[in-house]
Amino acid sequence: MSEQPHPFARLGQEPVATIERDELKRKLDDGEPIKLVMALNRWAFEAKHIPGSLHFDDPEELFSALDKDNEIIVYCSNIDCLSSVALYRALIERGYSSVRRYAGGLLDWEGAGLTLEGNSV
């Protein structure tokens, strides 16, 4: 079953490019050089996140840490969370060329029984 983005995620804009859980897991398992970025507050990141995830406290820190040709995957809590959509759009607008959204986010990852890291796990 393919998850559909929240209807507001596409209002007046191009659709958001996405990645499914199985492909993301394969990339992580294979050690591919992706940049997986959690688009939630620091406290949420510290509580739980997908292993290998990055977190940035402000956009300028993020933009200076990532190269425009990095493969970047953004996620947040679940398919209805728009933080990852906003981050996706900000990266695209800044000229990052390989950005996708893991729409299912933490809820989908945890629901599949996959490993999480953090102080609430």
What kind of region is each of these model predictions?
Residues D30-L36, P51-G52, E71, S97-S98:
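Short active-site oxyanion
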Residues G113-V121:
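Active-site neighborhoods of enzymes that stabilize oxyanions during catalysis
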Residues E20, D57, A103:
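Short loop/edge segments at beta-strand edges and connector loops
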Residues M1-A44, S120-V121:
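Flexible, polar/low-complexity N-terminal or interdomain linker segments that lie immediately upstream
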Residues F63-E110:
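Catalytic cysteine-centered active loop of the rhodanese-like fold, especially the PTP/DSP P-loop
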Residues L54-E60:
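Glycine-rich, highly charged phosphate/nucleotide-binding loops
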Residues N41, P59, G105-L106:
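A generic "binding-loop/recognition-motif" signal
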